[in-house]
């Protein structure tokens, strides 16, 4: 199993200390958000020297996803152009850091979250047209772009994500699968179908899986326990990975590093049972 964690979930300061702790915990991959792991970095602060320094401090810890979580659905054209430039800067980092992909979600359409607004064709086309120049620039730089679906955002289903990938029409467009991103209190019975659909439609584009979990408490509200302590069907995920020959990093999200080893022990036990 290719094990990883988000850098900002590691209780250390500085990329070197974070990478050393990741290795100490038995992992080899990081999801790196530079703003959250490199002290003092702000958008616009790219330099080749900084990128090379980060690469050296990571050592043999590999970057699964370089996070650039912009909002391609921003209301104004000016805001969207600003988001594009932020992402392009991360692509310049990626040319040196060599992650599997630079990743983003897609935001919600309009001033407040609304399923009705998110599911309009106008919302979809805004995301598509914002991502086109990003994908083209990434292709020039030899970098992959990965898109992550979220139930409350414009790209909110595996089928919609497949449409976006096909419409962008480039081989460097990939997908991140975070099963819990699709969970709502009223759709937990559909999660197995969402897992199966994701692998059926996107197995050829998946670059990373986010590991967390969900459960419903006695009051009927969603809670988020550590991986394999809730209701998410990890057995089905591993069965699909085997079926479709998907061998990609599994990245803990929102799990402190001191609980990483126990989390992966549980996942390994499930995987070994299939």
Predicted regions and their residues:
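Acidic/histidine-rich catalytic cores of soluble enzymes
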Residues: 30, 36, 66, 132-231
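Catalytic domains of carbohydrate-active enzymes, especially glycoside hydrolases
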Residues: 16-35, 97-98
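Active-site acidic/histidine proton-transfer and metal-coordination neighborhood
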Residues: 16-17, 52, 57-60, 75-175
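Conserved, mostly hydrophobic/aromatic
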Residues: 22, 30, 83, 94, ...
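Short, well-ordered coil/turn segments that N-cap beta-strands
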Residues: 1-3, 26-28, 59-64, 97-100, ...
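Glycine-rich, proline-tolerant flexible connector loops at the mouths of alpha/beta enzymes
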Residues: 32-54, 106-113
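Boundary/entry segment of secreted carbohydrate-active catalytic domains
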Residues: 1-13
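Short, acidic/polar
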Residues: 11-22, 82-91, 188-199
């Amino acid at each position: 199993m290719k094990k990883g964690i988000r850098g900002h979930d590691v209780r250390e300061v500085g990329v070197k200390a974070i990478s050393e702790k990741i290795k100490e915990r038995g992992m080899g991959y990081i999801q790196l958000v530079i703003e959250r792991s490199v002290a003092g970095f702000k958008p616009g602060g790219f330099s080749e020297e900084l990128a090379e320094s980060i690469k050296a401090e990571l050592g043999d810890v590999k970057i699964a996803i370089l996070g650039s979580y912009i909002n391609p659905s921003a209301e104004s054209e000016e805001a969207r152009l600003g988001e594009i430039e932020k992402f392009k800067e991360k692509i310049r980092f990626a040319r040196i850091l060599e992650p599997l992909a630079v990743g983003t979600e897609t935001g919600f359409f309009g001033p407040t979250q609304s399923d009705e607004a998110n599911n309009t064709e106008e919302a979809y086309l805004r995301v598509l047209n914002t991502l086109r120049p990003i994908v083209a620039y990434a292709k020039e730089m030899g970098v992959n772009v990965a898109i992550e679906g979220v139930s409350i955002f414009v790209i909110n289903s595996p089928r919609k994500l497949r449409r976006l990938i096909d419409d962008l029409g480039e081989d460097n467009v990939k997908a991140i699968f975070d099963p819990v991103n699709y969970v709502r209190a009223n759709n937990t019975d559909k999660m197995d179908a969402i897992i199966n659909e994701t692998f059926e439609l996107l197995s050829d584009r998946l670059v990373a899986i986010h590991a967390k979990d969900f459960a419903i408490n006695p009051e009927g509200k969603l809670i988020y326990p550590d991986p394999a302590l809730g209701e998410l069907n990890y057995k089905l995920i591993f069965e699909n990975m085997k079926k479709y020959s998907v061998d990609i990093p599994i990245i803990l999200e929102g799990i402190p590093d001191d609980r990483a080893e126990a989390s992966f022990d549980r996942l390994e036990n499930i995987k070994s049972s299939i």
